């Protein structure tokens, strides 16, 4: 079976989900080496002051496979991320609809980044009402049918996405390709329609 390779990501961006849902056999490559300053351990949300970058700290340096990467709890980053999500989305139309499914994630202390990211991915797929059909690699994927592992650049997010109403749209110009939670909290059940339309572009 030919696999389509994706990286494990922390509250992945919208474009990731559009691509992920368009593939027959999406596979998370858990053996790829961790790469700094990527969505593997960070996400972008829209705060009252504009784009906000949230980063999960890593416990060690040097090359490691994603499956072996441990999270650092030297600082209470979970409280910071939880407060940031609440400040950003408490006023959004669907925050109360989804908060009981997403906010408890910040109360768990996963040892490995991969486990945290996989729980987030599974929960987001459930909220999008999409069948959980992805697999995990058994080794590094050398020759995937399609390779999406480098497709999403946290430094240069995708800019040509259709606009939807964001929480602070009255004072902040639309920011595309934030974490898919931005779409969920603002569009709710219609989020899947937006993603399917992106798949066709």
Predicted regions and their residues:
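Residues lining hydrophobic/aromatic ligand-binding pockets adjacent to catalytic sites
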Residues: 1-201
